[in-house]
Amino acid sequence: MIPILFFYIPGWCSSHNFYVTLVSKKYFMSLDFHPLSLADRSLVWKYTENAGRRNCDLSFANLYAWRMLYRTEVAEWGGFLVFRFYADGHLAYLMPVGEGDWCAILQALKEDACRLSHPLLLLGVCEDLMPQVEECMGEDCRVNANRDHADYIYLRESLALLSGKKLQAKRNHVNRFKALYPDYRYEELTDEWVPACLDLTRRWVESRQDEAEKRAVAAESEAIQRALAHREELDLRGGVLLVGEQVVAFTYGAPICRDTFDVCVEKADVEFEGAYTVINKEFVSRLPEQYKYVNREEDLGVEGLRKAKLSYQPEMLLMKYSVWSSCTVKAEIEECGLTPEQHLIKWQTRALWSLCFGDTEEFMKLYFTRKYTPERNSCLVRDGRVVAALQRLPYRMMFGGEDVSMAYVSGVCTQPECRGKGLMTELMLL
């Protein structure tokens, strides 16, 4: 007997249409995830070395350095390697790496997400893999391309030589740096230089003025500390740029696949004009020739960073798509009587709760399946997104000799960038 699953896509339209998928029993083999550790390096490389995938998300050095922030887990399934993590409170999966039945693995991910009461969110889906997604998921998904997360990929030789008219300005930067600081030198990154690199990172964090930006760079600082603490285990290559005995720039990276090297981090003291250009050139010129390409990662929508990355004349911009597919069962709508709008608000509130409190999946599932109702949830929506929410849980108590209906307020949460703007006061007065 073939089981029938019903999938609903929140927020697509105002209708209550359901999409029915017939699923083979083999798709229900569970994924055995475990927290990513240093011991997984050889496992990851086994899948990524010859996969031809060049996106920076698959660099083991990145995966490990950021694992605490994203709570990254890994599993093997049906010839594929899968990463599961949390992005801004949303359960998410990287597009699987490997060879096998694509429809089977995508269905397995959908079922895993459903088991954890989440819709399926796939990240890092490159354009060459979109045919597999479309074939297996059909209309049962939404696709979004975000230019801010496109990877900048360069020819190694181009960055090493800076030849040609278009890179004349870069050569000028290098020559000016050499003229200003004739006592400069480049050294391989070793344990000797790690304290100075961390000190430069600390000063970089402290230079930020905006509080939201400070939080973001503080997270990157922690990732840098974690990577440098395990430099050898992660197979990092790196370099430092010195003027006299002062470290004015450092960088490091690691392979993504056989022909592509990822520059994970590059930091420089901006007081030393041209330091960024010089550390980049010196480092890349020493990479093995097997690496035809160098990935210098995303610009994250930062205008200055985008301008700088484009100025090096990338060979390609690797677009990465996010794919969203809901796998909540039909009962969520029919039995609970939620409208599509209420359903979407529930998922967004759940994601915000997870982002703010970091509760376990067991607790989240318990609350949002047994206690949550639209009536108990007060939220503020801006541009289609829940930016603040709180829960009003009913209870009764004796007050002044009378049995009075009360509400206990809990789950008070606000998007980080919206804090300090009076949103919770507005909510409490609703």
Residue ranges, per PLM feature:
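Acyl-donor-binding surface of acyltransferase catalytic domains
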Residues: 10, 16-17, 27, 98-190, ...
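Short amphipathic alpha-helix that is part of the acyltransferase structural core
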Residues: 24-56, 161-223, 327-394, 401-408
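Conserved donor-binding loop and adjoining core beta-sheet/short helix segment
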Residues: 57-129, 242-272, 347-421, 425-426
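Conserved catalytic-core motifs of GNAT/GCN5-like acyltransferases
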Residues: 144-152, 315-328, 397
